[in-house]
């Protein structure tokens, strides 16, 4: 793809998300979603092949269906309230339709089926945009209307997402699918705490974006897309491989890494609201994610292929031209847990 065309598409995606975040009018919100979707489709098809075409088609069908449900909810709310303002939610059916549309765009269970397939069919940099930046616009709109939506629907969908994100990643060998199921589980945690403390949900989103961006950057740096390829990179670039495994454990929420901080704060917030069974169930389901992350770490670093001493020579190692941005993201993704007291004060 021509770099100028790609730059225009990325600017359009940025503009669409910004419009959704800053607008208080339903028409502008819908317009921002459409700009985002139409610019994202060519980005998904950047590498022209049948898998990318199939992934872009699935993405378009899902997002178009969600947009139709969103427009239907907007029209019903307009009939009841007579206003285009986002905060003027006076219809229960409209809020339910809007919730369904937003969780479809986010990829929460039971509307999650498109996320692993689309992520697997596109390149790593397109998957990075899909699993990070594309979550911001639906979450920002849900943040604005969370007080008007049915909390029981969000509760059930978030629990299902945590469960599906754990179970779905157990037998996966493709790293992009593993990251997709990890995204589903993290979205479940964000939506769950949004019911009780929306600001904490934004903190969770920030840490998730940092960890996922670091993971995808390292995979692109290493040109790794499967667990088999990851296990073979140890003899070539052990430092990068070790960093990938540490970030995977951070995504799983293993202390004392950064990924433990949002889970810790979410469970603490739920217990403050006299909820005991719910955080216990969430913590047990989170062990599923941690299990397949630890299994991936074990198979990649502790069970290596038989090699000769010549393969471990210095001349075999690839030069590490790591950027400052990647280094900063990796550092935050691993060592942000000491900032937990400050985060508790702010949120």
Swiss-Prot record:
Report the main location listed first in the record.
Answer: mitochondrion
InterPro entries named among the record's database cross-references: Complex_I_Subunit_2 (IPR050175), NADH_DH_su2_C (IPR010933), NADH_UbQ_OxRdtase_chain2 (IPR003917), ND/Mrp_TM (IPR001750)
The record's annotation in Pfam families points to:
NADH_dehy_S2_C, Proton_antipo_M
Which top-level group of life is the source organism from?
Eukaryota
Q: Where are the transmembrane segments?
A: 3-23, 25-45, 59-79, 96-116, 122-142, 149-169, 178-198, 201-221, 239-259, 274-294, 326-346
Q: Which UniProt keywords apply?
A: Electron transport, Membrane, Mitochondrion, Mitochondrion inner membrane, NAD, Respiratory chain, Translocase, Transmembrane, Transmembrane helix, Transport, Ubiquinone
Q: Does the keyword Transport apply?
A: yes
Task: Quote the catalytic activity from the record.
Answer: a ubiquinone + NADH + 5 H(+)(in) = a ubiquinol + NAD(+) + 4 H(+)(out)
Q: Where in the cell is it found?
A: Mitochondrion inner membrane
Give GO cellular component annotations, separated by semicolons: mitochondrial inner membrane
Task: Provide the topology term for how it sits in the membrane.
Answer: Multi-pass membrane protein
* Top EC group: translocase
The UniProt GO MF terms for this protein read: NADH dehydrogenase (ubiquinone) activity
- Tell me the Gene Ontology biological-process terms attached to this UniProt entry: mitochondrial electron transport, NADH to ubiquinone; mitochondrial respiratory chain complex I assembly
Enzyme Commission number(s): 7.1.1.2
Q: What does this protein do?
A: Core subunit of the mitochondrial membrane respiratory chain NADH dehydrogenase (Complex I) which catalyzes electron transfer from NADH through the respiratory chain, using ubiquinone as an electron acceptor. Essential for the catalytic activity and assembly of complex I.
Quaternary data: Core subunit of respiratory chain NADH dehydrogenase (Complex I) which is composed of 45 different subunits. Interacts with TMEM242.
* Family to which the UniProt record says this protein belongs: Belongs to the complex I subunit 2 family.
Protein name, per record: NADH-ubiquinone oxidoreductase chain 2
Q: Which organism is it from?
A: Sylvisorex johnstoni (Johnston's forest shrew)
Q: What is the lineage of its organism?
A: Eukaryota, Metazoa, Chordata, Craniata, Vertebrata
